[in-house]
Amino acid sequence: MELVMKDAQSLTVSETTFGRDFNEALVHQVVVAYAAGARQGTRAQKTRAEVTGSGKKPWRQKGTGRARSGSIKSPIWRSGGITFAAKPQDHSQKVNKKMYRGALKSILSELVRQDRLIIVEKFAVEAPKTKLLVQKLKDMALEDVMIVTHEVDENLFLAARNLYKVDVRDVTAIDPVSLIAFGKVVMTAEAVKQVEEMLA
């Protein structure tokens, strides 16, 4: 299939990577798994067995007029243990390579259909200056954008790192969540070839 580039040239790309049907269920599963994998899972609370304190009965069972009590570590008491205490856990979900690649292909194909994927011959700035990149993006009418190159140019990376809703990555760093999150994705022709090789 042919994709029209920004400068009116066309680029021949694989239909299996950029022209497949959108598999919403697969994309949802991969995105949820990706987000789950980012969770720290380090929260921890103490049960009544783990709270520091004496095991002594606070007062005798009968005769005081107070409610009976057997431990200062009871969950009913202030500073007592937690009834169903949270423990550290691994939230990661398994996603095999075939599913992950399939989700990326689905997302890239949907970006093409929605005219959110812009292909350029090359994308660079002459110096590591934010204003140069801002002007370049303004000329292209782009704001919320992820720029994908076959290798990250240092000038481009430094110019973009202080910009809101602008991200620069190489092909190996793209992921399903980021591709969906940005309004537009600018990709160099070299990066497109690299993506095809990576997802082949």
Swiss-Prot record:
Entry GO terms, CC: ribonucleoprotein complex; ribosome
PANTHER family, A to Z: 50S RIBOSOMAL PROTEIN L4, LARGE RIBOSOMAL SUBUNIT PROTEIN UL4M
InterPro entries linked: Ribosomal_uL4, Ribosomal_uL4-like, Ribosomal_uL4_dom_sf
Protein's UniProt name: Large ribosomal subunit protein uL4
A Pfam family this chain is assigned to: Ribosomal_L4
Function noted in UniProt: One of the primary rRNA binding proteins, this protein initially binds near the 5'-end of the 23S rRNA. It is important during the early stages of 50S assembly. It makes multiple contacts with different domains of the 23S rRNA in the assembled 50S subunit and ribosome.
GO MF assignments: rRNA binding; structural constituent of ribosome
Disordered: region residues: 44-70
Subunit and partners: Part of the 50S ribosomal subunit.
Keywords: Repressor, Ribonucleoprotein, Ribosomal protein, RNA-binding, rRNA-binding, Transcription, Transcription regulation, Transcription termination, Translation regulation
GO biological process terms held by the UniProt record: DNA-templated transcription termination; regulation of translation; translation
Family assignment from sequence similarity: Belongs to the universal ribosomal protein uL4 family.
